[in-house]
Amino acid sequence: MFHLRTCAAKLRPLTASQTVKTFSQNRPAAARTFQQIRCYSAPVAAEPFLSGTSSNYVEEMYCAWLENPKSVHKSWDIFFRNTNAGAPPGTAYQSPLPLSRGSLAAVAHAQSLVEAQPNVDKLVEDHLAVQSLIRAYQIRGHHVAQLDPLGILDADLDSSVPADIISSTDKLGFYGLDESDLDKVFHLPTTTFIGGQESALPLREIIRRLEMAYCQHIGVEFMFINDLEQCQWIRQKFETPGIMQFTNEEKRTLLARLVRSTRFEEFLQRKWSSEKRFGLEGCEVLIPALKTIIDKSSENGVDYVIMGMPHRGRLNVLANVIRKELEQIFCQFDSKLEAADEGSGDVKYHLGMYHRRINRVTDRNITLSLVANPSHLEAADPVVMGKTKAEQFYCGDTEGKKVMSILLHGDAAFAGQGIVYETFHLSDLPSYTTHGTVHVVVNNQIGFTTDPRMARSSPYPTDVARVVNAPIFHVNSDDPEAVMYVCKVAAEWRSTFHKDVVVDLVCYRRNGHNEMDEPMFTQPLMYKQIRKQKPVLQKYAELLVSQGVVNQPEYEEEISKYDKICEEAFARSKDEKILHIKHWLDSPWPGFFTLDGQPRSMSCPSTGLTEDILTHIGNVASSVPVENFTIHGGLSRILKTRGEMVKNRTVDWALAEYMAFGSLLKEGIHIRLSGQDVERGTFSHRHHVLHDQNVDKRTCIPMNHLWPNQAPYTVCNSSLSEYGVLGFELGFAMASPNALVLWEAQFGDFHNTAQCIIDQFICPGQAKWVRQNGIVLLLPHGMEGMGPEHSSARPERFLQMCNDDPDVLPDLKEANFDINQLHDCNWVVVNCSTPGNFFHVLRRQILLPFRKPLIIFTPKSLLRHPEARSSFDEMLPGTHFQRVIPEDGPAAQNPENVKRLLFCTGKVYYDLTRERKARDMVGQVAITRIEQLSPFPFDLLLKEVQKYPNAELAWCQEEHKNQGYYDYVKPRLRTTISRAKPVWYAGRDPAAAPATGNKKTHLTELQRLLDTAFDLDVFKNFS
């Protein structure tokens, strides 16, 4: 019997490929689709003759049947034919026919059953094959789409066509189909829209429509999305027959936009042929693409678009999308014009812009902002996202329906820069989402001189977007209408689903990396083809002329009209006498400055508060303002301790921060604190978000229960990213001066992962782009034996980048000297030693009449240090931030007796005071704390030095000599005293690593620096 079944299996014809069989077994949806066909199957019947005792007889009958089917009884003939046709067990056997008048009819019926069974199976398998074919196009059709306008490369870097994509009929066999099936009609599954109004189509037409939808100039990558509704939406947009239609008016608008894009670059090339401008030649379609996205978004209710982009095509975008005055752009090419504004300025292809205008297509107001950026590719991505989030927050746009972002990328940078990945992973986090960004990749298939095969390991440069289920639309940029359609769909996707979407413009770069570069050195064959390539404007104009949409004179008139606009603007640019960087401001703050951009005053009010306000905030900070909310027992003890401090009129570090935040919220200042684990605090000191111990995910933020009409407080744990998150918070702070935006590093050591944001945006941002920013960086810092990665926020690096002159003593008699210093510096660097001073510097950040970045080296061990407490008296009305905290002990009472004046900053003060007391030197050694390191407090330190005429001067720090503050403080302190005395050093020796990881070594080093600080004879041999 086994032999019979084996023979039958061998003889069974293969009607479909193994792929289709697997598909039919593993796809329950397909089974449901063909359920009505499967109802023809006969119920299982007994086959009692197939027993072991009769196997020899059955095998003899089978062999006889193979030689001559007519040599066996008709019932055996039917049985063997059914078995070979693949009938399931129990259905092959038909009962012997009775000898009656109706026997002939019964024989005919049995014969029909024999023939029907294989037909039904073939029908099912063919339908499954067609469904598998349709799905193959949907999944992999983009691999064989005609995307490269040069016709040289496959845009996906894979030269092999997927074997299961049919581009010719010889591949039908892969699905168990053949040419005889091409004219058969197949029912279409519900997962395709190629039928339009029809539910069934011939296979030939199915293939043709799939080729049109997925294998022409658009490659749609979307089947990795795990949401059926979203996949169906995309299928409907690209599969529906005739859906990609444009009116003649739309075609003329597209042509006009291509004219502007192309002729702008040609005008710049004629006038400044030797200037770098990073032109758009080869991807001129970018301008109409962006305008289409903006038009469609405006139609859907968006009234503010924030953009970020690299250098390629930036001037064209400024001119033809944002509509910057052409003469202002042309002025940037004039090397004779001087800048009117202070600061370094930046090259023309880095500048930003802000403009409000009427969208002529929708007749609605729209605001466009292009964020200024450095040459560090993709660094502006999170900045744009942060600014977008802020603008959405300020206008109450909780769903992203009014404010959106568009990010432009180069193909090499999009694949190569890690910040792209970090930014994508912010896209759907509750406190960071902007409800969808439209990404446009200018994929010119080259990175400077690097071939794509050397620039990425993934098939496409856009594959990073798959991690957030963003659909990716690849499009041949030499087909302007395909580009326009894809951009419309991208805008609609963002409006409908509020998720990211990527448009991959596969294009080429007609010139070198810049206009002076020779690309033939490294890409000779590509550039031979490019030299032959007809510009897209010429191609499209010829197409429209052939279609009768425009005629040649109309086309030429459009060109001459725009050329005239450029010439007139060029003439006006000759009248400009000076360059104004502030004309390129990307984030104006209306009403904050005077009309000429100056602060409205040069003073700062007291940052103190009344005792009632301090007490009220303290009481809320030490309680749970929500009923039936169970907190952790350990947290109850922390809140109880806070309550006792309030009663005793003292604050620790966490409570001082709470009071600064709470008071600003009362004044209508929004506060946003972001970073890793900031809700609780890395050191479990903050606890701004309380968690119910009995109800999962139930939380309470007491800070939002302080006042009836307070501003909202946002505190959010960030993703484990520094670069992306700091960039995001910088962008958030750009949007408004009336918000305190803080980013806290988990440890200060980790800020260098975000070094690009610090070096390119925060430090020089105002100098380059006339753009102030009040972001606050909280960087936990302190040498406590925790090793080289948990000790140092690298203060030496921040101080090195301060813009004051160490060798020039400013005019100390100048009115408002301290405020003028703050106004002129590029950022403020502080290291507070008391909670009260920390409270004041946070409040001062908002009460100042201008904005500067604030770098705070925050403590770790001081968070719970019993001496690191401040009284309410230090925070009452009339009090201010103390730039310098002078000695106030016995040494200050008898300054003539002081032998040494120690200057220090931060936590080391408490080590010094403890050691001084232990050595009984409180009258001989004075200790002055410099709380604000930059701008340097020349005026206050001069008073301190003059107060102790007999004292030698020493700087004491816990950091190593080549790190920390010494190299910054020493020359400035020497300048303060006109170099009358040396400034000695007491601290750790130079080292490569910031700190030791050995506790004993740490304590030995600490004792050594304390010995140096209090040994009054140690420096005599160096005099």
UniProtKB/Swiss-Prot annotation:
<keyword id="KW-0832">Ubl conjugation</keyword>
<dbReference type="GO" id="GO:0005759">
    <property type="term" value="C:mitochondrial matrix"/>
</dbReference>
<keyword id="KW-0786">Thiamine pyrophosphate</keyword>
<dbReference type="InterPro" id="IPR001017">
    <property type="entry name" value="DH_E1"/>
</dbReference>
<dbReference type="Pfam" id="PF02779">
    <property type="entry name" value="Transket_pyr"/>
</dbReference>
<feature type="modified residue" description="N6-succinyllysine">
    <location>
        <position position="564"/>
    </location>
</feature>
<feature type="binding site">
    <location>
        <position position="446"/>
    </location>
    <ligand>
        <name>Mg(2+)</name>
    </ligand>
</feature>
<comment type="function">
    <text>2-oxoglutarate dehydrogenase (E1o) component of the 2-oxoglutarate dehydrogenase complex (OGDHC). Participates in the first step, rate limiting for the overall conversion of 2-oxoglutarate to succinyl-CoA and CO(2) catalyzed by the whole OGDHC. Catalyzes the irreversible decarboxylation of 2-oxoglutarate (alpha-ketoglutarate) via the thiamine diphosphate (ThDP) cofactor and subsequent transfer of the decarboxylated acyl intermediate on an oxidized dihydrolipoyl group that is covalently amidated to the E2 enzyme (dihydrolipoyllysine-residue succinyltransferase or DLST).</text>
</comment>
<feature type="modified residue" description="N6-acetyllysine">
    <location>
        <position position="970"/>
    </location>
</feature>
<dbReference type="GO" id="GO:0005634">
    <property type="term" value="C:nucleus"/>
</dbReference>
<feature type="modified residue" description="Phosphoserine">
    <location>
        <position position="100"/>
    </location>
</feature>
<dbReference type="GO" id="GO:0006091">
    <property type="term" value="P:generation of precursor metabolites and energy"/>
</dbReference>
<keyword id="KW-0539">Nucleus</keyword>
<keyword id="KW-0496">Mitochondrion</keyword>
<dbReference type="InterPro" id="IPR031717">
    <property type="entry name" value="ODO-1/KGD_C"/>
</dbReference>
<feature type="cross-link" description="Glycyl lysine isopeptide (Lys-Gly) (interchain with G-Cter in ubiquitin)">
    <location>
        <position position="534"/>
    </location>
</feature>
<dbReference type="GO" id="GO:0045252">
    <property type="term" value="C:oxoglutarate dehydrogenase complex"/>
</dbReference>
<feature type="binding site">
    <location>
        <position position="444"/>
    </location>
    <ligand>
        <name>thiamine diphosphate</name>
    </ligand>
</feature>
<feature type="binding site">
    <location>
        <position position="446"/>
    </location>
    <ligand>
        <name>thiamine diphosphate</name>
    </ligand>
</feature>
<dbReference type="InterPro" id="IPR029061">
    <property type="entry name" value="THDP-binding"/>
</dbReference>
<feature type="binding site">
    <location>
        <position position="143"/>
    </location>
    <ligand>
        <name>Ca(2+)</name>
    </ligand>
</feature>
<comment type="subunit">
    <text>Homodimer. The 2-oxoglutarate dehydrogenase complex is composed of OGDH (2-oxoglutarate dehydrogenase; E1), DLST (dihydrolipoamide succinyltransferase; E2), DLD (dihydrolipoamide dehydrogenase; E3) and the assembly factor KGD4. It contains multiple copies of the three enzymatic components (E1, E2 and E3). In the nucleus, the 2-oxoglutarate dehydrogenase complex associates with KAT2A. Interacts with ABHD11; this interaction maintains the functional lipoylation of the 2-oxoglutarate dehydrogenase complex.</text>
</comment>
<keyword id="KW-1017">Isopeptide bond</keyword>
<comment type="similarity">
    <text>Belongs to the alpha-ketoglutarate dehydrogenase family.</text>
</comment>
<feature type="modified residue" description="N6-acetyllysine">
    <location>
        <position position="401"/>
    </location>
</feature>
<feature type="binding site">
    <location>
        <position position="676"/>
    </location>
    <ligand>
        <name>thiamine diphosphate</name>
    </ligand>
</feature>
<keyword id="KW-0809">Transit peptide</keyword>
<keyword id="KW-0324">Glycolysis</keyword>
<dbReference type="GO" id="GO:0006104">
    <property type="term" value="P:succinyl-CoA metabolic process"/>
</dbReference>
<dbReference type="InterPro" id="IPR032106">
    <property type="entry name" value="2-oxogl_dehyd_N"/>
</dbReference>
<feature type="binding site">
    <location>
        <position position="411"/>
    </location>
    <ligand>
        <name>thiamine diphosphate</name>
    </ligand>
</feature>
<dbReference type="GO" id="GO:0004591">
    <property type="term" value="F:oxoglutarate dehydrogenase (succinyl-transferring) activity"/>
</dbReference>
<feature type="transit peptide" description="Mitochondrion">
    <location>
        <begin position="1"/>
        <end position="40"/>
    </location>
</feature>
<feature type="binding site">
    <location>
        <position position="156"/>
    </location>
    <ligand>
        <name>Ca(2+)</name>
    </ligand>
</feature>
<keyword id="KW-0560">Oxidoreductase</keyword>
<feature type="binding site">
    <location>
        <position position="444"/>
    </location>
    <ligand>
        <name>Mg(2+)</name>
    </ligand>
</feature>
<dbReference type="GO" id="GO:0005739">
    <property type="term" value="C:mitochondrion"/>
</dbReference>
<feature type="binding site">
    <location>
        <position position="312"/>
    </location>
    <ligand>
        <name>thiamine diphosphate</name>
    </ligand>
</feature>
<dbReference type="Pfam" id="PF16078">
    <property type="entry name" value="2-oxogl_dehyd_N"/>
</dbReference>
<feature type="binding site">
    <location>
        <position position="411"/>
    </location>
    <ligand>
        <name>Mg(2+)</name>
    </ligand>
</feature>
<keyword id="KW-0460">Magnesium</keyword>
<keyword id="KW-0007">Acetylation</keyword>
